[in-house]
Amino acid sequence: MKFNRFTKYLIVFALILLSTTTLNYTTSLRAQEPPQVQITQPEPNPIVPDSIFMSQLPSWARLVDIRTVNPNIRLDIRYATTNNFLKRKLYPISKCALRSSVAQKLALVQTDLEKIGLGLKVYDCYRPFSVTEQMWEVMPDPRCVANPARGSRHNRGAAIDLTLVDRTGKELEMPTPYDDFTEKAHGDYQGGSAESRKNRQVLKDAMKKHGFIGITTEWWHFDSEDWQKFAILDISLGTIP
């Protein structure tokens, strides 16, 4: 079929008009589409290697020996002995290490308790991640040991296991001994003696005042309320000054 020049121009014009209309319509549809939301999965807390530990952590986040902050806090670091539920020595030395800011808060708890003739005795503080792995290998039970897949708040240097003592260092009566994983160790257990429940509450109130939160299953365990800001560490206790 042959077209004269005018007809050809008319066809070209029609095609241009059709293309413009289609483009405008498509643009209009895109403008009406809701904006795409990009969801970013949070990165897991990194394990900080020994080589950069001291040099890169800010002073408030470094691990410190609690005895350098308040020497009046008594120690009975059970995992440095065989006197624990695993019957194994897991720490090379008896030391309570905590993040500096956490240690400062615990020192304030000790100071307050001394005003009423009491004090703290610590069973466990910072726990290297590799020790948690060892514990899980022996007893892979989340009721007793933190699953290494998530890590422990002890691994962050932001958790403490402890009890109360009198002026002479004698432990006050509590509902259970340390590392008793029965319901009697729960924070709301109403059995046992009235004295043990009162002492448990004194400890809880003293810790809460300075920013520590207890857990439901262990009367002796307290987390710093800001524990999430600290990364999991695997620093040997022997390297902490």
What are these regions (language model features)?
Residues K2, T22-L23, V122, W219:
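Intrinsically disordered, low-complexity peptide-like regions
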Residues K2-I11:
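Bacterial N-terminal signal peptides that target proteins for export
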Residues I11-T22:
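Bacterial N-terminal signal peptides
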Residues T27-Y123, E137-T217, D223-P241:
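Extracytoplasmic cell-surface/polysaccharide-interacting catalytic and binding patches
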Residues P128:
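Segments that shape or occlude catalytic/ligand-binding pockets
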Residues V131:
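Short, well-ordered surface patches within globular domains
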